[in-house]
């Protein structure tokens, strides 16, 4: 079987790509015009809508098995404001709930910042999904556990409608793991262009497809080594009752919620070997706006995760500061591979996230 899927906040359909053979996308909701163009080209049989706040079932009155939503994380992520659900964009979770209540799909799959594992955020998301009839289980993990060269740290939640008995999934396509060990493109390009900046932004907004598959299949089967199996058998996860900590740092990193109680479970993680990237300061220009300049070599275990905002600053900072050493364009510029005056490559950013050029099509066809 394959789930007929509505993907909200779709971007370049990274969740659908990660769940290829498990999910069949029939409709997308995405506000970014560049992403809309890609979706209409890549998924010509699917419908594309542009505003999640106005979208209703009357716009697409067909049966849906699954809704997926990587709703904006600006209010939660370390790179964002960390204002939680008070942030306008992160508050769009209310539209996820509204649309879920309209369609009543068998499954809802959510993706967001690892900050969602804090119980004050779980109290909003998980308890609301429970209230509307969904049993939630979730996992928090970094992209380096599936081989990526960065550590995108995300929270994934599988919400199953309480009256639905999950069925065995026979994966309908031969999906294979992304190869981060070969065919790495150059990390910089000579010139700044609209096409390159667009791909940097789209990669930064996107998910890591293999990380999506790892989380979904692990939560569905109870086996976190099942990502590339051709048959996925529903399974259970057994945890222990979570003992709440005092203060705001209480977390349930991997867990589920049942009968008004949080449970946590453990799982084995093996991360890829560190890259140990050397980042060194260079000659300091007379004019710069940098504060807290770095005056020594820094060793970064992994590359920083691509971020959408880098699309407007692909050259990076002209001096190395402690803060800018955590921004990918500057990190690349001052690494052993970087050249001052060149620009962060969108094709390389997409490679870091785990998208092959065949999938991206025209998005990578620029100089």
Swiss-Prot record:
Active site positions: 73
Pfam family, one: DNA_methylase
Catalysed transformations (reactions): a 2'-deoxycytidine in DNA + S-adenosyl-L-methionine = a 5-methyl-2'-deoxycytidine in DNA + S-adenosyl-L-homocysteine + H(+)
EC code: 2.1.1.37
MF GO annotations: DNA (cytosine-5-)-methyltransferase activity; DNA binding
Family matches, as CDD domains: Cyt_C5_DNA_methylase
InterPro entries from the UniProt entry: C5-MTase, C5_DNA_meth_AS, C5_MeTfrase, SAM-dependent_MTases_sf
Transmembrane segments: none
Top class in the EC scheme: transferase
Family membership: Belongs to the class I-like SAM-binding methyltransferase superfamily. C5-methyltransferase family.
Name listed for the protein in its UniProt record: Type II methyltransferase M.CviJI
Species in which this protein is naturally found: Paramecium bursaria Chlorella virus IL3A (PBCV-IL3A)
